[in-house]
């Protein structure tokens, strides 16, 4: 029995198929990866967060996009659909169709069991190469927890010596408030998780900080 032959597509072929497909798929290195459906809890958390961002940023020059807008990571050729995107400069798109954003400022992912490893690892490693990106937030759907990575100023005498550092702040508990300083806004976890129910209550709250250097512990390729 012969092994099943993989079919590889060019980015142009992927986009042609994607724009007429009934479901969304991601693209990387010639391969297409169908996206799984989301749980009601995942959808509610993403909706709450989007609504909160839209209201908070209403009078500011920032736009909030849902998971229907693709993002392209130009350095690697990854096409993906973050759960929530914030763009605060004039949007730059991959082509005149204006359905693939190149310059997100903030990317937010609501974690799912099937995507958490990739969102924390390979996908974040690629997101970090987007020059416009300043903030990356991971929102748990299993407990009240928001992990917020913030790009720090590069250090080094030359571009070759510079190291991009990302500061992690973890907000846990419904009485905590996530702060996105680059946007000048606060996101109360009680509003992010409004009407979200868990089998067991999560007690306590805390804020943790740790610095990670670019490239550490992110080796898995996106799937």
What does each model-found stretch correspond to?
Residues 1-223:
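Gly/Pro/Ser/Thr-rich low-complexity, intrinsically disordered segments predominantly at protein N-termini
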């Amino acid at each position: 029995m012969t092994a099943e032959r993989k079919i590889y597509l060019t980015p142009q072929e992927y986009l042609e198929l994607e724009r007429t497909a009934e479901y969304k798929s991601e693209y990387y290195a010639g391969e297409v990866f169908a996206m799984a459906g989301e749980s009601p809890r995942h959808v509610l958390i993403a909706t709450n967060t989007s609504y909160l961002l839209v209201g908070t940023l209403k009078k500011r020059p920032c736009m909030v996009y849902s998971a229907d807008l693709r993002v392209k990571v130009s350095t690697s050729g990854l096409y993906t659909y973050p759960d929530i995107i914030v763009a605060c400069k004039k949007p730059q798109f991959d082509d005149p169709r204006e359905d693939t954003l190149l310059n997100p400022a903030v990317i937010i992912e609501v974690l799912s069991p099937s995507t958490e490893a990739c969102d924390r690892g390979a996908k974040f490693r690629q997101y970090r190469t987007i020059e416009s990106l300043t903030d990356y937030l991971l929102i748990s759907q299993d407990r009240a927890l928001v992990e917020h990575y913030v790009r720090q100023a590069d250090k080094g005498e030359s571009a070759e010596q510079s190291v991009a550092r990302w500061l992690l702040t973890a907000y846990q508990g419904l009485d905590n408030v996530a702060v996105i300083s680059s946007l000048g806004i606060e996101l109360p976890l009680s509003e992010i998780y409004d009407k979200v129910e868990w089998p067991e209550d999560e007690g306590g709250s805390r804020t943790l900080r740790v610095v990670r250097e670019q490239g550490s512990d992110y080796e898995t390729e996106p799937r």
